Amino acid sequence: MVIGIDHGYGNMKTATRCFPSGVARYDKEPIFQNNLLVYNGMYYQIGEEHKEFCAEKTQDEDYYVLTLAAIARELDGKGMNQAKVHIAAGLPLTWVATQKEDFQKYLLQNESVDFIFRNKEYHVEFAGADIYPQGFAAAFYRLQDFKGINMLVDIDRKSTRLN
């Protein structure tokens, strides 16, 4: 199963789900358990705030944990709790050349993973990950219509980028 994930600073987005890119980590089980993800003996509250800008999305485990939450939300919407998943993710165009390989390794740091999200157990095997320039998918099927010089604008929660 291919799952496309937009790892935004404001929101994580998939084909059918969108949620804030916030992660709060706890050593002990928190009292409030809305959107609680349990992974590797740690507790993560998902979506409580937005992720601060960082030039390297691999600098901490937040985007990995957010990826697990995004996959769980997609699987849950299909009535599933296990799957072999191929991730399709994006990076800003100017970062693809320098960060593509590291981001791919980051997303594939485990061959498989077991975790709990919203009190439901999940088992995910990773079949691979492809990294694309953000926004490219929106324009891909219309490329034949473009003439001359064209620009792609990526409008996010707090930023706008011209590609």
Regions from the language model: what does each represent?
Residues 1-152:
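Nucleotide/phosphate-binding catalytic cleft detector across ATP-hydrolyzing
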Residues 160-163:
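Conserved small/polar residues in nucleotide/adenosyl-binding loops
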